[in-house]
């Protein structure tokens, strides 16, 4: 059936990605992080990895729509969500929505930007430019909200820590 390992792994990845598909209340097809759609939401970090490493299994328009879904659910100050559930609940920090693990994740906007970058690499530049123009100000605002120390590094205050993933150092 398969002529090589790469073909087999691509087929397996496609099946897993297909199992991640859920339809949100607003009709947006989103991708959950677990391959069986039991997580009821779009996690920006996991989706970014999915697009980068198994994006061949996701139509460009679904990626565009997931980015739009995330941007629509940013906080009033511009902070991007950690995840957005199928019913539209935006959650900004790791953990249970009612009991977050620290302040909002420091990597929400950076991972959304990684997704935008992955999309840009697979689209014709002329087709991508209007999308980037649509998102640029919101992505920039999300980046400018990140706490930066005197050396220009993302800063995670140990007295009031954000939920980190690896883009920060805690003092």
Each model region followed by its residue ranges:
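Aromatic- and histidine-enriched alpha-helix N-cap/loop-to-helix transition segments
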Residues: 38-49, 58, 103-114, 134
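Short hydrophobic/aromatic segments of transmembrane alpha-helices and their interfaces
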Residues: 31-33, 45-46, 136-137
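Low-complexity, Ser/Thr/Pro/Gly-enriched N-terminal "stalk/linker" regions
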Residues: 1-42, 64-65, 69, 78-80
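Alpha-helical support elements that line or immediately flank enzyme active sites
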Residues: 46-77
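Alpha-helical scaffold segments in carbohydrate-active enzymes
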Residues: 11, 15, 69-76, 118, ...
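The feature captures the catalytic groove of carbohydrate-active enzymes
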Residues: 30, 36-38, 82-111, 117-121, ...
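Soluble or luminal CAZymes and related metallo-dependent hydrolases
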Residues: 4, 131-134
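Short, solvent-exposed positions on alpha-helices
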Residues: 61-64, 126, 130
């Amino acid at each position: 059936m398969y002529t090589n390992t790469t073909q087999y792994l691509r087929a397996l990845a496609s099946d897993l990605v297909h199992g991640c598909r859920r339809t949100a209340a607003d009709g947006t097809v989103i991708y959950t992080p677990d391959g069986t759609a039991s997580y009821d939401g779009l996690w920006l970090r996991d989706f970014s990895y999915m697009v980068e490493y198994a994006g061949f299994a996701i139509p460009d328009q679904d990626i565009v729509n997931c980015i739009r879904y995330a941007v629509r659910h940013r906080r009033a100050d511009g902070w991007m969500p950690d995840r957005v559930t199928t019913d539209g609940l935006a959650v900004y920090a790791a953990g249970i929505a009612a009991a977050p693990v620290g302040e909002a994740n420091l990597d929400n906007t950076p991972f959304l930007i990684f997704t935008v970058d992955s999309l840009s690499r697979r689209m014709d530049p002329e087709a991508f430019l209007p999308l980037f123009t649509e998102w640029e100000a919101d992505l920039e605002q999300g980046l400018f909200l990140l706490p930066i120390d005197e050396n220009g590094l993302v800063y995670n205050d140990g007295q009031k820590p954000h939920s980190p993933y690896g883009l920060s150092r805690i003092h």
